[in-house]
Amino acid sequence: MHNIIKSTLSMSPVIPVLTIDKVKNVEYLFEALICGNLKVVEITLRTSCALKVIEIASKKFSSLKVGAGTVISDKDLNSVKDAGATFAVSPGFTLPLATHAIEIDFPYLPGISNSSDIMNLTNLGYKFFKFFPAQASGGIEYLKSLNGPFPEIMFCPTGGINQENASKWLSQKNVICVGGSWIIPAQMNDYKEIQKRALYASRLAS
């Protein structure tokens, strides 16, 4: 389970975080991301069609690793697994949810914002975390400070990350990738622009 998270997060320097409110033409979004060489996506459970979008992405785009975001309960976790998601992501965590992910052997990236969160989750075997909200929780300087007591822990900072500052985040030795919504802002349907942004993002760590 944890090895799958590691290999998945290593596939793309930037994970687009998408909140999609309609199913129509959603395939074009994923095609644009793939053409832009981004292979991992997070689809948040913030809309009524999110599970359907996850199902479409999982079934039609075998080269894409489909993450489900805003997973906050056992029910959510079971639902995204059934929909075909590759992994689940939370803005925070609860010990019951983190334990349930282990019990059903489903790759899970819990959200953390402080040392106590990390200590609770490492006791369960977790080593990869979503640092959220990254900018509001202390930014790069705080993330740097976590490397001292937790040298084996890796993070996917999300929240306040954009095209201008993503490279600086990615240069930190305890950052495996970053998450961001700037690649596909809400209501954007310019697929050439999405592909262009995705291609730029895919090269940030090179």
Task: Name these PLM-found stretches.
Residues 65-68, 86-92, 107-111, 127-133, ...:
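Short hydrophobic/aromatic-enriched beta-strand-loop microsegments
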Residues 78, 97-102, 119-124, 139-142, ...:
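Short, charged, surface-exposed secondary-structure boundary motifs
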Residues 87, 91-97, 130-139, 173-197:
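Glycine-rich phosphate-binding active-site loops on the catalytic face of alpha/beta enzymes
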